[in-house]
Swiss-Prot record:
This is Serine--tRNA ligase. Consists of two distinct domains, a catalytic core and a N-terminal extension that is involved in tRNA binding. GO terms for biological process: selenocysteine biosynthetic process; seryl-tRNA aminoacylation. It catalyses: tRNA(Ser) + L-serine + ATP = L-seryl-tRNA(Ser) + AMP + diphosphate + H(+); tRNA(Sec) + L-serine + ATP = L-seryl-tRNA(Sec) + AMP + diphosphate + H(+). One of its GO terms (cellular component) is cytoplasm. It holds the Pfam family tRNA-synt_2b. L-serine binds at T237, A238, E239, E291, S390. The lineage of its organism: Bacteria, Bacillati, Bacillota, Bacilli, Lactobacillales. Residues 43-55 have a biased composition (Basic and acidic residues).
């Protein structure tokens, strides 16, 4: 959430910044007008409360002197009613202000490419040249099906579209990737966490998913009343429970930075994705991901973003997967992010790079919503800065391995870094069928 004081005192700057993220200037004019009205009502209420105290003293003095205090008592009642009405007005205006603030995205960093969509993203660097073959490479969904290690058809019967079964070496590969990521992240100084996979609405609001993106997630409903949502949602990313672990806490600056990592399932409705990536592992309703989160002080978050991005890059380099890093434009960056680097891995069958990790600096945006603070050496409180990044998306990594390490005979070589996690397996061959 943005700081209303920053918007109030830098209105033109705020309009210019948020215009690059699709926010109309009238929205900020409306917000500032509500804020002005709220502050005026609050000031008047405080003045009346002071007057009430003075009248109360007058009544007490009159009673001590055995004087008539009826006029003062009448005034006291009138002032009390005014205060009650004003406090109700302040509360209503506060809620209107909060409604708008919760739906405004973060201010973009000055270094962000300006543009309305992904076509304005800028390549920052590239690692290794795209994989080339002397045969026509197959897409990962064909490879997985032919090797009998991925099964979308049965998953469609059991669950619906955008679900998959991993089998045999496919399941082993997915588990190997997950464990490899966690081991590498912990070597890089992250503490492993196993978080809850169901979170409440306050947590979803704290990291910025609610109230703007309620259609993108799966919320649990009451068994007795399907139209009544329970206060529980399946996590769209482990970022939600990891960041909210610190919600409402005051940290010691000496503890920072705090680095945590978690492997978890992620559940997404993919609202608005109809017709996109209908085949394969790229866009699923349920997938697994290793997440990295940093809680840092306000002065180091930009350096920490570079470290976070390099942590994610390190994983792709160890796996030998070609990729490039792109800086997202103001119109393509996520709602909570001030700056995002996307890591996009090369997919030979698609002949293009596809996103496999987003590394973002959310500055104090999530911390203000979640009230995550730290106390400096002088005892002063500051809002922390939060960062998050995929380290990495597991299913997309499996897809990239199948496509980049495929052989002409349909088998797939296992990256050297994963062989110890796959009982020494060096080549994935066709699995025998079962249950058919």
């Amino acid at each position: 959430m943005l700081d209303i004081k920053v918007i109030r005192e830098n209105l033109d700057w705020s309009k210019k910044k948020l215009a690059t993220r699709g926010i109309k200037p009238e929205e900020l004019d409306k917000l500032v007008a509500i804020d002005k009205e709220r502050r005026e009502a609050l000031t008047k209420s405080e003045q009346l409360k002071q007057k009430r105290n003075e009248v109360s003293d007058q009544i007490a003095q009159a009673k001590r002197n055995k004087e008539d205090a009826s006029d003062a008592i009448k005034t006291m009642r009138e002032v009390g009613k005014e205060i009650k009405d004003l406090d109700k007005e302040v509360e209503d205006l506060t809620q209107k202000q909060k409604y708008i603030l919760l739906r405004l995205p973060n201010f973009p960093a000055d270094s962000d490419p300006i543009g309305p969509d992904e076509s304005y993203n800028e390549e920052v660097r590239k690692w290794n040249e795209p994989t080339k073959f002397d045969f026509e490479p197959k897409p990962h969904w064909e490879i997985g099906t032919e090797l009998n290690i991925l099964d979308w058809d049965t998953a469609a019967k059991v669950s619906g579209a955008r679900f998959v079964y991993y089998k045999g070496a496919g399941a082993l590969l997915e588990r190997a990737v997950s464990n490899f990521f966690l081991d590498e992240n912990t070597k890089d100084g992250y503490t492993e966490v196993i978080p809850p996979y169901l979170v409440n609405d306050a947590s979803m609001q704290g990291t910025g998913q609610f109230p703007k993106f309620t259609e993108d997630v799966y919320t649990i409903v009451d068994n007795d009343d399907p139209d009544k949502p329970r206060d529980l949602t399946l996590i769209p990313t482990a970022e939600v429970p990891l960041v909210n672990y610190f919600r409402g806490k005051i940290l010691d600056a000496k503890q920072l930075p705090i680095n945590v990592t978690a492997f978890s399932p992620a559940f997404r409705s993919e609202a608005g994705s109809a017709g996109r990536d209908t085949r394969g592992l790229i866009r699923m309703h349920e997938f697994r991901k290793v997440e990295m989160v940093k809680i840092v002080d306000e002065d180091s978050s930009w350096d920490e973003l570079e470290k976070l991005t390099h942590n994610a890059e390190h994983l792709l380099q160890k796996l030998g997967l070609p990729y490039h890093v792109v800086a997202l434009s103001t119109g393509d960056a996520s709602f909570t992010s001030a700056k995002t680097y996307d890591l996009e891995v090369w997919m030979p069958a698609q002949d293009k790079y596809r996103e496999i990790s987003s590394c973002s600096n959310c500055t104090d945006f999530q911390a203000r919503r979640s009230l995550i603070r730290y106390r400096d050496e002088n005892g002063k409180l500051h809002l922390a800065h939060t960062l998050n990044g995929s380290g990495l998306a597991v299913g997309r990594t499996v897809a990239a391995i199948l496509e980049n390490y495929q052989n002409e005979d349909g088998t797939v070589n296992v990256p050297e870094a994963l062989q110890p996690y796959m009982h020494g397996m060096k080549v994935i061959t066709k699995e025998p069928k079962f249950g058919e």
